[in-house]
Regions:
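P-loop (Walker A) phosphate-binding loop of NTP-binding proteins
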Residues: 26, 38
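Walker A/P-loop
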Residues: 32
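ATP-dependent NMP and nucleoside kinases share a basic, alpha-helical "lid"
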Residues: 109-117, 122-159
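Small-molecule kinase domains that catalyze NTP-dependent phosphoryl transfer to phosphate-bearing small molecules
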Residues: 106-109, 137-138, 158, 162-207, ...
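Extreme N-terminal, non-catalytic leader segments
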Residues: 1-19
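Hydrophobic anchor at the beta1->P-loop junction of P-loop NTPases
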Residues: 23
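ATP-binding Walker
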Residues: 29
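ATP-dependent small-molecule kinase phosphotransfer cores
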Residues: 50-121
Length: 221
């Protein structure tokens, strides 16, 4: 289990710690299930995947991508995610180039959104590549959503209409669910029913909320 990272700048609201929580997990493990449940409960969810899509419309990002990959990634005067994806998927060098351009934009946007929501006690960051992108220092606690390998494979094949070989290739191209679980403060096993997943989320929320209240009490005392 990991502890609070030394690069984090802690903020306080009326003397209370504001906690940014990362939600991560490997492909087809069910991060969206967790995020949607938290969103329905009224918590703010910063969606890194959406920020990644927005990055492709940013003029500075687009200019750098065109310079690196050429006009072959352009379709209808926009960057084609499909064409860009074909260039980077399975190509480590191209993927590094893409990440070096897009990740700084995403990091900047996350920090801005965390600042906007700095009046809230708990803010959640939904990000698949939390560890791979080196964004751990943007959060104080990490929730890893985990599923059993066989279930992960079956879900990915069904969701993306992939063959077993294609799905395995995508799973193996990322950090494994087991490895990510070792780095989390909390692990949600999403292998069973949604109700069971929700129960685990509620337990974590209770601990997080109680922790914030406890910090407040310590400060006031």
């Amino acid at each position: 289990m990991i502890t609070v990272y030394d690069k984090i700048v802690h903020k306080k609201l009326n003397g209370v710690d504001i906690v940014n929580i990362g939600i991560t997990g490997s492909i087809a493990c069910g991060k969206s299930t967790v995020s949607n449940y938290l969103r329905d409960k009224g918590y703010t969810i910063i969606d890194a995947d959406k920020l990644g899509h927005t990055a492709l419309t940013d003029n500075e990002v687009r200019e750098k991508l065109e310079k690196s990959f050429g006009l072959r990634i352009i379709e209808n005067n926009e960057i084609s995610r499909e064409k860009l994806g074909k260039l980077v998927f399975g190509n480590e060098e191209n993927l590094k180039i893409l990440n070096s351009i897009v990740h700084p934009y995403i990091r900047k946007q996350i920090l801005q959104l965390q600042e906007i929501h700095s009046d809230e006690r708990l803010v959640f960051l939904d990000i698949a590549l939390l560890f791979e992108a080196g964004f751990e220092n943007l959060v104080e606690k990490i929730i890893v959503v985990h599923v059993d390998e066989k279930i992960q494979l079956a879900r990915l094949m069904s969701r993306n209409s992939l063959s077993k070989e294609q799905a395995m290739f995508r799973i193996e191209s990322q950090m494994s669910s087991n490895d990510k679980s070792k780095l989390g403060n909390y692990v949600i096993n999403n292998s069973n029913t949604k109700e069971e997943t929700y129960r685990q989320i509620d337990l974590i929320l209770d601990e997080l909320e109680r922790g914030v209240i406890k910090n407040d009490e310590c400060i006031r005392n």
